[in-house]
Amino acid sequence: MNITPCSIKTLKGLYDISGVEVGQHFYWQIGGFQIHAQVLITSWVVITILLGSVIIAVRNPQTIPTDGQNFFEYVLEFIRDLSKTQIGEEYGPWVPFIGTMFLFIFVSNWSGALLPWKIIELPHGELAAPTNDINTTVALALLTSAAYFYAGLSKKGLSYFEKYIKPTPILLPINILEDFTKPLSLSFRLFGNILADELVVVVLVSLVPLVVPIPVMFLGLFTSGIQALIFATLAAAYIGESMEGHH
């Protein structure tokens, strides 16, 4: 059987695609603990970008905002409207929390498409968006759960737990299960969408490295923004629900 060089090249390309792996991690050993270094490094980069942008934009605030200050005031107004719509008139104290969630997830998602993480080589695994890792999304979801429990308990006290037996005690197991499914759905939805988007781009770049991946990358940017909005909206809705009562 004759195997042409073209066939060998095609087979090699398919083999390279089949070698795309997930789940490879780079750890730091600190004392008796293993720290997931990839997530920490990329999260620090995202936090630095956010803090640096805010400091530069508002270092000299003007009565009539211009440029960066105007942009961040627009973002703040958007987050305030989102919080007020979902939480109600008592939204004020929760704007920083919802805003932090939205901005961190938004910049994290976009960093996976816009920052050249791949050029930084690690002993194991590779750098990617923080939200590309299940540890990050689970942590964000658990923070959201803690926030809506705190919101309900701070407003209603122990009577908050009456929601589990409303409208009838028969629904107690379902109402308890609902509180477990909320963080699960939040974390896996965000993780799955971001991971799938990055894998699709990697495979397309391996197949056709020039033009074809570009529309998919733009679609990924749009999807990343939508996922950040969905997470922040649901977080605010859960907080509002815990303060108002069971729906």
Swiss-Prot record:
SUPFAM superfamilies in UniProt: F1F0 ATP synthase subunit A
Keywords (A to Z) from UniProt: ATP synthesis, CF(0), Chloroplast, Hydrogen ion transport, Ion transport, Membrane, Plastid, Thylakoid, Transmembrane, Transmembrane helix, Transport
Database matches in InterPro entries: ATP_syn_F0_a_bact/chloroplast, ATP_synth_F0_asu, ATP_synth_F0_asu_AS, F0_ATP_A_sf
Main localisation: plastid
Subcellular location: Plastid, Chloroplast thylakoid membrane
Keyword Ribonucleoprotein: no
An annotated GO cellular component: plasma membrane
Entry coiled-coil feature ranges: none
Any one GO MF annotation of this record: proton-transporting ATP synthase activity, rotational mechanism
TM stretches of this protein: 38-58, 95-115, 134-154, 199-219, 220-240
Keyword Transmembrane helix assigned: yes
Topology of the protein relative to the lipid bilayer: Multi-pass membrane protein
Role: Key component of the proton channel; it plays a direct role in the translocation of protons across the membrane.
Subunit structure, interactors included: F-type ATPases have 2 components, CF(1) - the catalytic core - and CF(0) - the membrane proton channel. CF(1) has five subunits: alpha(3), beta(3), gamma(1), delta(1), epsilon(1). CF(0) has four main subunits: a, b, b' and c.
Database matches in HAMAP family: ATP_synth_a_bact
Similarity-based family: Belongs to the ATPase A chain family.
The name this protein goes by in its record: ATP synthase subunit a, chloroplastic
